[in-house]
């Protein structure tokens, strides 16, 4: 039985997921080794039963953290995919300045509309 695999995205450019898609196209035999049940960049299905979860992107909101915890509860194995998931990536640059200043710079007068906190891998 092939392990069920899911891919999830958080705050990122999603380039790492696109690299996975490119790799799968170049090595189609990998698709015989796993069953992909969720992967927004590649399929429209949304399976909730998976053994391995690949997570791309950094965590920048409370809702991200809650979603990540749900993913972790379902997966036997959780893999951080890419620099954003592992180290915070480019998104972590905002951690170098006061968060209120960053929010005002990025969102302007609508800064209060967006719930965000310091970027975490």
What are these model-predicted stretches?
Residues 1-121:
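Iron-sulfur-associated redox domains of electron-transfer enzymes in respiratory
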């Amino acid at each position: 039985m092939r392990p069920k695999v899911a891919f999830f995205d958080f705050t990122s450019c999603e380039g790492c997921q696109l690299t996975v898609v490119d790799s799968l196209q170049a090595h189609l035999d990998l698709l015989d080794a796993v069953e992909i049940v969720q992967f927004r960049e590649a399929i429209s299905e949304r399976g909730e039963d998976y053994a391995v979860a690949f997570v791309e992107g950094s965590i920048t909101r409370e809702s991200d953290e809650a979603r990540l915890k749900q993913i972790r509860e379902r997966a036997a194995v959780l893999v951080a995919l890419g620099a954003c998931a592992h180290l915070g990536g480019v998104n972590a640059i905002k951690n170098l300045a006061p968060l209120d200043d960053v929010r005002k710079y990025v969102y302007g007068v609508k800064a209060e509309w967006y719930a965000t906190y310091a970027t975490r891998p």
